Amino acid sequence: VAQPAYLLHRGDALDAYGSWPAPVAVISDGAYGVRGFHGDTTGVAPLADWYRPHVEAWSRHAGPATTLWFWNTELGWATVHPLLAESGWDYVQVITWDKGAGHIAGNVNGKTIRRFPVATEVCALYQRRLELPGADGLMPVQQWLRHEWQRSGLPLARANEACGVRNAATRKYLTQDWLWYWPPGEMVERLASYANERGAESGWPYYSLDGQAPVTGKAWDTLRHKWRHVHGLTNVWRLAPLHGAERIKGTMKRAAPRVYRPSSLSAAHLNQKPLQFMHRILNAVTDPGDVVWEPFGGLASASVAAIEAGRFPCVAELDHDFAEIAAQRLADALAG
């Protein structure tokens, strides 16, 4: 039986997570606290509770190298950040989408406004916090690397000999301060071989993830989230909100509680994301064939980009009308 090119769940993502394959990346574009869709909150105070069951599910199903992209307003992201941190997601950086002055043109009353007009939103990148098992239980990866060497009873300086370096092992790979550097798989494999050949007898092999055998360099490298660098690209992305052919309009439906009289020129979704941005974040942290979750699909822009990029998207959308549009966009993307 041929495998589908994507999975679309017409309903709550909470009912779909258990049947989806584990994600390499999660792209979240849910509640902002701005009444931006039916089901969005009024204000940011309820956001943590709104996201909590989803964050718990992401945490259960994520792999050690899963990344999370979290779209929101500045304040919405700041409100949910503590929940993400306590749930085992480590902050990497924030991308700022600068929509330009055209985004607020004609919508600012200079006599009543008491702040600078907002023409941005953000997308925060998180990586799954890595804790590794050992003879003495789970430990953060930085602590685990040094602890395994110390457990062998070998002098710390011998780690440099094991890695064939002057001092990089003790100065970078095994240090416990801010100078710590993620060691390449080749170096971890060398540490493991040296410690197991020359260290004290132990019931749990040194640098083992399962208590049976030391970790290999190849296995070690899969524990770190992927990253594909693009020179010249910073964390500020300047692009006007969609207005051209990519923007979906004319559904004559109220896209959100604050939309009262939609016309044939009204956007189907108030905050449709550019495919250009979705391709950018997918390219940064995933490879062809990787599973991408889009739990709050809307118009499924992330999943459309995922299909175009050869990834395997799993998308959910609760709103019937949005789900219909998403289904058509996904089919069109697959057809090329």
Q: What is each of the regions a protein language model found here?
A:
Residues 2-316, 320-323:
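Core catalytic lobe of class I
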Residues 322, 331-336:
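Conserved phosphoryl-transfer catalytic core
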Residues 326-327:
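Conserved SAM-binding loop
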